């Protein structure tokens, strides 16, 4: 499955996706959650649930402000395998929880140099006219990540919003975070990742044509480019594959193309029952 082309404004079900801050009037004065939300793990889900409940109680619209690319990948050009999920997966998950709208801010050089107060003033106040702003406890924003909970609280009266901090979600006395999940993925502990995400971890990618050698030895595989995903420990995994509406089990190898004797890192999947 490929990431959809998202223009200035797209409709995904009943959820509108904005790629700039030209926000419709009906979405101004809403309840807003802010963050990278990479993986949309159980901690993120807690933030979204509380924000959604507030929106319902106040009869307001509910939206999320997030960033693309993930800031870590913007600041570290050499970091290629960092994401827990793709933008397409993020959009799909948010659509399922019935978000009213999603704002994807282009994280570029100009935006990275915006001060914390300017972010509050220009994005939360002028463009969104936010009524309530929900964040996780460790969220940082603005130039050099100087914006934090204290800064957000300090500007509440000036910019006419109320900020609400969600208590962190914990698992075995550890705060659930995207960075923790990446570390666990690196170690290949995918069942543990499932608990932190609240669902199985999955990847999507373009199937590329190989040399057909696996087919010749009776072990045909789909070769999938993983792009910017966090890569698990090299090895063999039992997987479930979804192709359109068809679900199949299979076995996958993440490594250096064992059936091809090559050196490039690849995900190869043998899907049971498909020749």
For each of these PLM feature ranges, what is it?
Residues 64-76, 81-127:
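Active-site-proximal cofactor/substrate-binding loop regions of enzyme domains
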Residues 41, 94, 133, 193, ...:
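Residue-level signal for inorganic ion chemistry
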Residues 208-275:
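Phosphate/ribose-recognition catalytic cores of enzymes acting on nucleotide-derived substrates
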Residues 113-220:
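Classical nucleotidyltransferase
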Residues 2, 8-30:
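Positively charged, low-complexity intrinsically disordered leader regions
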Residues 22-82, 86:
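N-terminal catalytic cores of NTP/NDP-binding nucleotidyl/phosphoryl-transfer enzymes
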């Amino acid at each position: 499955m490929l990431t959809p082309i998202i223009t200035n404004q797209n409709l995904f079900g009943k959820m509108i996706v904005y790629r700039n801050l030209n926000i419709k009037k009906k979405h101004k004065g809403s309840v807003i959650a802010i963050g990278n939300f990479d993986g949309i793990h159980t901690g993120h889900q807690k933030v979204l649930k509380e924000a959604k409940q507030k929106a319902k109680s106040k009869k307001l619209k509910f939206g999320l402000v997030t960033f693309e690319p993930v800031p870590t990948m913007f600041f570290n050009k050499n970091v290629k395998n960092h994401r827990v999920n793709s933008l397409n997966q993020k959009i799909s998950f948010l659509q399922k929880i019935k978000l009213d709208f999603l704002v994807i801010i282009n994280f570029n050089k100009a935006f990275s140099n915006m001060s914390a107060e300017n972010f509050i003033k220009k994005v939360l106040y002028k463009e969104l006219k936010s009524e309530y702003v929900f964040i996780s406890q460790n969220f940082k924003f603005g130039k050099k990540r100087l914006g934090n909970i204290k800064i957000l609280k300090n500007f509440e009266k000036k910019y006419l919003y109320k900020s609400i901090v969600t208590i962190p979600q914990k698992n075995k006395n550890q705060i659930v975070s995207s960075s923790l999940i990446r570390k666990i993925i690196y170690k290949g502990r995918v069942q543990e990742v499932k608990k932190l995400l609240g669902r199985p971890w999955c990847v999507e990618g373009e199937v590329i044509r190989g040399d057909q050698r696996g087919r010749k030895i009776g072990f045909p595989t789909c070769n999938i480019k993983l792009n910017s995903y966090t890569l698990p420990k090299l090895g063999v995994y039992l997987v479930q594959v979804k192709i359109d509406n068809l679900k199949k089990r299979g076995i996958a190898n993440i490594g250096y193309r064992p059936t091809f004797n090559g050196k490039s890192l690849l995900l190869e999947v043998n899907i049971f029952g498909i020749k």
